[in-house]
Amino acid sequence: MREEDIRSTAGHGTSNKDWWPNQLNLRILHQHSEKANPMGPDFNYREEFKKLDYWALKEDLRKLMTESQDWWPADFGHYGPLIIRMAWHSAGTYRIQDGRGGAESGAQRFAPLNSWPDNINLDKARRLLWPIKQKYGRRISWADLMILAGNVALESMGLKTIGFAGGRADVWEPEEDIYWGSEQQWLGRDRFGEEGKLEDPLAASEMGLIYVNPEGPGREPDPLKAAQQIRETFKRMGMNDEETVALIAGGHTFGKTHGAASPSHLGPEPEAAPIEEMGLGWKNSYGTGKGGDTITSGLEVTWTSSPTKWTSNFLWNLFGYEWELTKSPAGAWQWRPKNGAGEGTVPDAHDPNKRHAPGMLTTDIALRVDPVYEKIARRFLENPDEFAKAFARAWFKLTHRDLGPRSRYLGPEVPEEEFIWQDPLPKRDYDLIDEGDIAELKKRIQASGMSIREMVMTAWASASTFRGSDKRGGANGARIRLAPQIGWEVNEPEQLRPVLETLEGIQQEFNRSQTGRKRVSLADLIVLAGCVGIEQAARNAGFEITVPFTPGRVDATQEQTDVESFSYLEPVHDGFRNYLKRKFSVPAEHLLIDRANLLTLTAPEMTVLIGGLRVLDCNWGRTKHGVLTDRPGALTNDFFVNLLDMRWKWNATDDENVFEGRDRATGELKWTATRVDLIFGSNAQLRAIAEVYASNDGQEKFVQDFVKAWTKVMNLDRFDLLVKK
């Protein structure tokens, strides 16, 4: 090859996505593979964290805060405000709708987050932390370090935090599964519908922002409109009004914003910066490009007279002055005290001979003009201890919301208190059932009269609420019997309740018969019944198998279940049950991939589960769509065999989600199926997997793989088993 002929390299050029933009994105089911992870398959971050000299690390972080570096000088001689912003923006991407985002993976290091306009100059914060990360290596992840550094920053400035939990393992490549919006430009706002409703599952109001635009919606400096967006955005991030006020007022107690000059002085973001910038972005051509010449948001505001100390001064200033609109040197809308009030009360970040007036953002003024926010903010002003405690608790929630239940928490500063947002579970105070008990319970389940479909559907409904994104949901707790899950349409309440009553009867009878401390939970019994159903179905197909089962689940109470918070886990679509709550603009097969990703399934696991659940007649509403078998209730590979059989010609119907399979020779109607079903014959990659199971030698492999995938789903929230490993 002549060198002048080299125009590109491997992996470049026009992609399949360029040719076919609506193609299924199956890559999100295979991200974060061992091939991308330099730590190797045997690396166990939990075990490495336990070896960490935690207190020495905190001391190193404390020293870092006041050791200003010439290459990026600390505002007011303290890096605390910058580090807090980094930690906040790492955690603040979380949204409760799908549990994605947040601090748990350390994704701020990668695109797109590392180049968002709201994260300008946080690349400097991470570089300041690098010597400490380098020192402690594998024993502290970037994900944990960023949050712990935020805690230490707060503590070093006088706030008493309520604790810290480690356990966040780093990813090593960008997260491709998170939908951040469809806008093609930064700060785009196409995510709002005609009635002003923010698109699901998004929380941030504009592309590239963590929360809302500090100048106001679309840079309109209207505090009341800003308050409306703040309330919606923070709600979608799992925060109530009190937590919202505490976080904004507490966070803006520290530091300043940066708008020394026009953002036109900034160079490209890290992902677009020249190679010699070594991963840093936003090179600033104004003045020295740092210190007093720093440009970040374009806003130039210092809120308090002591920006490196925890005080109530933000609230005092907010209510102590009357405010008027002005513009920053960069031309951004912000607020200043009227009639020159407050001049000289605020220090300069870098020049001890300069003083300024305090400033506010439109989103700060929102706390004063919104009647609900104002009442909370004034209460905090009058009760500074309550304010400090409210911020500390909201900060812990913000930074730990996506870490999962307390059983995943690591470290010596884990709070003793249990919070409702952690989806708490009771501690087991009884002995677990043994193999003999399991065999006896299986017999009782078999004799109960429950059908294979009822047992499998109930177990699936219980376990498949799990979200790998924020580690919520799952079978542990048996919350399927509690509000709100007991009433979810997808769970077919009228059919679910009798099944639960039958299982509760078996549970009570077994527990009453015990003379010792041995008990079985309903959560375990639901999963065990699913095992019984699958074993019977395999037997119907000619296979004797044992579905793995490990007891240890407990039963949560209604008091331990936040109904509003759990309502976000309701499946409005579940392709595994061929369920759509309503018509969506997104095709059903794409929704299936989204659901499979939340269940941490691979494409083969998703495929085999669909094939198995269809032949077990586990469709919502008992529809026959995709039940491509004459032997429902037998765990056969019939779904794949018939889906790929050229005898059948598939035709669209008036319902865009339903298709008819007719005999090519006679035109006789044989099958009906949905888009979710047909995609396993239509999509080339999924068809390749389906062919494995449709082959003459594929039946046994199908059963084995189905059982493995099923067991994985049943145990997704068994973090106790992972700890034992």
Swiss-Prot record:
Name assigned to this protein: Catalase-peroxidase
Which residues are the active-site ones?
A: H89
Per UniProt, the keywords (alphabetical) are: Heme, Hydrogen peroxide, Iron, Metal-binding, Oxidoreductase, Peroxidase
Catalytic activity, as annotated: H2O2 + AH2 = A + 2 H2O; 2 H2O2 = O2 + 2 H2O
Molecular function as annotated in GO: catalase activity; heme binding; metal ion binding
EC top class, as a word: oxidoreductase
| Self-association state and partner proteins as the record states | Homodimer or homotetramer.
Task: Give the family, as the similarity comment puts it.
Answer: Belongs to the peroxidase family. Peroxidase/catalase subfamily.
Name the gene that codes for it.
Answer: katG
Which species?
Symbiobacterium thermophilum (strain DSM 24528 / JCM 14929 / IAM 14863 / T)
Q: Which domain of life is it from?
A: Bacteria
Q: Which GO terms describe its biological process?
A: cellular response to hydrogen peroxide; hydrogen peroxide catabolic process
- GO cellular component labels: cytosol
Query: What Enzyme Commission number does this protein have?
Result: 1.11.1.21
Swiss-Prot/TrEMBL puts the cross-link Tryptophyl-tyrosyl-methioninium (Tyr-Met) (with W-88) at Y211-M237
